[in-house]
């Protein structure tokens, strides 16, 4: 529980990575559930830094709400829309980007989402 609370207080990906290293040093290689938690915390920190409003997963993929106040570079999203078929705009909501991870499994999908968020920053 101590680590969970500390993860929640991390604001930067580098802080999450430091905690991940500390946890691995103390307890050894973490199980899959902990790796998923760490991946989620990295995504939360990235999304917070970019001022992304929300990230949701549903049957269509990962939905990312990017309002005009965010720090996301719109030109990067447009460029990714042109070259990556996994990314589309929600026709019913002009602030929502739909991302369809190619990978299956929570850990792999989260890694893919993290890489995508880094590309739009």
Predicted regions and their residues:
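Accessory helical-bundle/CTD segments and flexible terminal tails appended to RecA-like ATPase motors
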Residues: 1-121
């Amino acid at each position: 529980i101590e680590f969970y609370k500390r993860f929640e207080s991390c604001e930067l990906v580098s802080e999450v990575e430091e905690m991940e290293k500390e946890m691995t040093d103390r307890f050894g290689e973490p199980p899959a559930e902990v790796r998923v938690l760490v991946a989620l915390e990295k995504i939360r920190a990235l999304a917070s830094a970019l001022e992304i409003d929300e990230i949701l997963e549903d049957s269509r993929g990962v939905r990312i709400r990017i309002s005009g106040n965010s720090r996301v570079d719109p030109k990067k999203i447009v460029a990714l829309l042109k070259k990556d078929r996994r990314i589309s705009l929600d026709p019913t909501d002009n602030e929502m980007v739909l991302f369809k991870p190619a990978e299956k499994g929570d850990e792999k999908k989260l890694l893919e989402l993290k890489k995508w968020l880094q590309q739009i920053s």
